[in-house]
Amino acid sequence: MKITAFPLFAAIALAPTLAAQSNPAPPQDSATFDPDGTAHIMRTVPMPTTISPEAQNWLASLTQQKGGQQTLAERRARTDEWRKFGSGEARKYYPANVEETTTAGVRTDIITPLTMPEANRNRVLINLHGGGFNSDSGSLIEGIPIANLAKTKVVSVYYRLAPENPFPAAVDDVVAVYKELLKTHKPGSIGIFGTSAGAILTAEVAVRLKQSGLPLPAALGIFSGLGDFSRVGDSRQLFTLNGFPGEMRPIDSKNLPDDQYVGKTDRKDPALSPLFADLHGMPPSLLVTSTRDILLSDTATLHRALLQAGVDARLVVFEALPHAFWYHFQLPETKEALEQMAKFFDEKVGR
């Protein structure tokens, strides 16, 4: 079985800082259009001056990465290697303690800050990692910084993965962990967050909890996600996971992505695609994306749906950076993004 080297919602591997190779510019900027409105675009996009020098160097380094084809086993091996490296980096920047355990029969990591105010001891955040639903790209990479900055315990959930376990297996696992935590925590003292696949799961879990009549958590963190598996947002036709660099493959209604996760579920099922669910009464939500994020459009569309349902939903869009850039701790923009995430939970959870 072959899949793309960087499937949708996978983490971006950290690359060394390299000078971008000089290539000849296209003869001229142009755009032509088919009768149905399909655009064929050639553009010259200079390195943005509106981001930090560190981010400029990082964007340049992404042009040196090579894609290609990988088997699922190869992808998981590569992602595991990245996760180990990224977790070590996370601890350097944001020290925290990590304990491996199980919760409701599901493997979890308990991440605790080195110091925790007494007022925060009743709070807990559930982290749902990214990785394209078929691997773990960021369990500790996501959970460690938030535990450190929010001075709050984080439970990172190793939910079952596709293709072996398609939807709704991952949702079932997270709900089981949430119900277990309800035995020791009030729902108002629990928050749920995730990046990419984990962001999608966060919204799906909230819908499941509402449909099941369970108490909802205090807050949701949806960091580069989507709410609709039946359609493709505009940014997915413009960007790869690295922004501009990388292989682009056209997506249309006949070859929608993520079949292995979706399985036999109707793509418009509200439990799978929260955009079709009743979102009234959903918890306060923070959504974070960036202007070269492959899921920029999908994140913005979900944000609008939450607003239309009267939800306290905030959208933060960072300039010129690609998908899940906050996995890369050398960037000042990452520090800002993580601090905003932690501040949001500090305001909403257990208060």
Predicted regions mapped to residue ranges:
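Positively charged n-region of N-terminal signal peptides that target proteins for export
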Residues: M1-A5
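An N-cap/entry alpha-helix motif that binds or orients negatively charged groups
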Residues: D80-V98
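Bacterial N-terminal signal peptides
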Residues: P7-T17
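Alpha/beta-hydrolase superfamily serine-hydrolase fold, recognizing
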Residues: S22-D36, M42-Q70, K92-R351
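Phosphate-/polyanion-interacting regions in eukaryotic proteins
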Residues: Q64-F85
